[in-house]
Amino acid sequence: MQLNSTEISDLIKQRIESFDVVSEARNEGTIVSVSDGIIRIHGLADVMQGEMIELPGGRYALALNLERDSVGAVVMGPYANLKEGMKVTGTGRILEVPVGPELLGRVVNTLGEPIDGKGPIEAKLTSPVEVIAPGVIARKSVDQPVQTGYKSVDSMIPIGRGQRELVIGDRQTGKTAMAIDAIINQKDSGIFSIYVAIGQKASTIANVVRKLEEHGALANTIVVVASASESAALQYLAPYAGCAMGEYFRDRGEDALIVYDDLSKQAVAYRQISLLLKRPPGREAFPGDVFYLHSRLLERAARVNEEYVERFTNGEVKGKTGSLTALPIIETQAGDVSAFVPTNVISITDGQIFLQTELFNAGVRPAVDPGISVSRVGGSAQTKIIKKLSGGIRTALAQYRELAAFAQFSSDLDEATKKQLDHGQKVTELMKQKQYAPMSVFDQALVIFAAERGYLADVELNKLLDFEAALLSYARGQYAEFAAEIDKTGAYNDEVEAQLKKLTDDFVATQTW
């Protein structure tokens, strides 16, 4: 068979055109050192701060230090089989986590992967963990309440939707218990909850999940876990991942509550990473940007206006405001709120609930110290009936503390002082509350009404909690419609006051406690 030169050249041309070759530019580097979860990479020229770097075996590292001739990255997960000389690739992507209603009722790790054994999560959307907080114009003032179910908190230190309220205290003072009760109280309120566990024992987290399930609150809660056994990188990133999941609801006109338990451990994890990256240490060996670590996280908790929600959803959701309320927890050492991280977070948040060891050990639980606990914006969001009735509670407790200290030095007290001491003692007793027993608006209002109108004067101190239980049981039995109406509206007027007075008078007449 004879082929002429034209046919040969056509054949070669055809073969060349049909040859399947794809050229792609890859941003590659080489690991030059591995130590304590930190890798140094040479040759990654085109990499951005916070970029995901793909490692052999399908794992990832996070680029944190961009230096002249190397990149310092922190490995997210185990790093035992990483070796010098291994090739790594820049992905050009920032860390993203799955978000959406599909995560409700699930326990996930920092990367949004399920760890509860209930199968995969079919989330349709992902969101970057680092997002710039809404600007001033996009925000709306806080004027709707988040009921925690605690008499002492809802009456004296009210929390509003979109607020950041710090829960601070020593270890074993009931900080987690307060946050979990606040989540349990949201199960019928339409507020979604996210609980972020940072650096805690796995057994403690399992107990929290079990309690949420027992009380029917897990179905509208996402639990994000970075336990004590996880790497420092995952503990540092967990709050941002949880916040991204909460922002999904905020930006679509829903309300969400997020608990960070606790940010002290996140700061310690970040300190560990920073020191290993050879960043210069500052006060208490924390890096210079530890304030920014918490401020950029907590500023993302906000109440956003209707225009923001409408713009974000491309007009699908109209006339609805969204909110993300944050309850960060900080653990103090021996009650020292003037340490570096506590003062930082106090200055960032809109108030703090200080839990005191002495009160906790004295049986006052929740151990809220009304002296230094404050809510800077929650007053305007407080339920009307609680706001009208609870004005004297904080004053009574503050005066009682002062007089109790004074009374230790004096035996002969005048009648007015004795009366004040007795009232303060009874209000302190009345503020006690069992765990996993959040109270409705009506129950709180009725108890505070009884305290403020002098109905406790003839009740012995050791019978006070029996009096409270019997009063609430009587009210729910005899005045069920009235109770349901107050729970729904939270309204207060002369008619409501007269009804509360009649109810309490009727109960006192029965003498059944």
UniProtKB/Swiss-Prot annotation:
Site label Required for activity, positions: 373
UniProt KW keywords: ATP synthesis, ATP-binding, Cell inner membrane, Cell membrane, CF(1), Hydrogen ion transport, Ion transport, Membrane, Nucleotide-binding, Translocase, Transport
Membrane disposition: Peripheral membrane protein
tRNA processing among keywords: no
Domain of life: Bacteria
Subcellular locations according to the entry: Cell inner membrane
Sample GO molecular function, one term: proton-transporting ATP synthase activity, rotational mechanism
Residues annotated to bind ATP: 169-176
GO cellular component term, pick one: plasma membrane
Catalysed conversion reaction: ATP + H2O + 4 H(+)(in) = ADP + phosphate + 5 H(+)(out)
The UniProt record lists the keyword DNA-binding: no
InterPro entries, alphabetized: ATP_synth_asu-like_sf, ATP_synth_asu_C, ATP_synth_asu_C_sf, ATP_synth_F1_a_nt-bd_dom, ATP_synth_F1_asu, ATPase_a/bsu_AS, ATPase_F1/V1/A1_a/bsu_N, ATPase_F1/V1/A1_a/bsu_N_sf
Coiled-coil stretches: none
PROSITE patterns for the chain: ATPASE_ALPHA_BETA
Function per UniProt: Produces ATP from ADP in the presence of a proton gradient across the membrane. The alpha chain is a regulatory subunit.
Family indicated by similarity: Belongs to the ATPase alpha/beta chains family.
Name this protein carries in UniProt: ATP synthase subunit alpha 1
Species of the source: Vibrio campbellii (strain ATCC BAA-1116)
Gene designation: atpA1
